[in-house]
Amino acid sequence: GCVTRCFLGDGEFALTPLFYNPAAIDVDEKSRVWVAEAVNYRQWNGRNPGKHFDAGDRVVIVSDEDGDGIAETSKVFVQDPDLIAPLGIAVIGNKVYVSCSPHLLVYTDKDGDDRPDSKEVLYTGFGGRDHDHGLHSVVAGPDGGLWFAVGNAGPHVVTAKDGWTLRSGSLYRDGGPKAADNQPGLRSSDGQVWTGGLVLRGDAQGR
């Protein structure tokens, strides 16, 4: 089988079976490593056979309990049918932001038990579902905003909670069987025609 390793600093920090097929990581204030797994990545039409999670992909928390620089434990924070190969994660306070086209999801742990008490779709409408050209990394910016990147597997038609709508497409057509028909020339609320990959800024309220 395939063994996945994670290196932080000068040596090997963790390896399978603490996690499988990591697509993105973040580190919280307790120095724990949060891993967004993409085990179920592109398994349609017999592609990528092997391990599969029927209940959806996972976010796991990997910990070095004794401070020796090597992780000993992991726990599942969330496993969700809406998670199909998530490609980005940001842990900000008690909120965990996960990029997984068509959604940017927010899981909130209100009681500190390392399990989500609520789930919110902060933004939706990104193309590239189950595709590596979809919604990618999400990070907290120094301005207090959320910054994230999306690839060219559109179309992306995303309406923020203040009504502003991003519309972006391109000539790229290899979006897989779950993709909508991509098209260039879409005009956003700002009057601009955005195309290809994008870097976007939003906020924790979905505006």
What do the PLM-derived regions correspond to, one by one?
Residues 1-207:
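Beta-propeller blade termini and top-face loops
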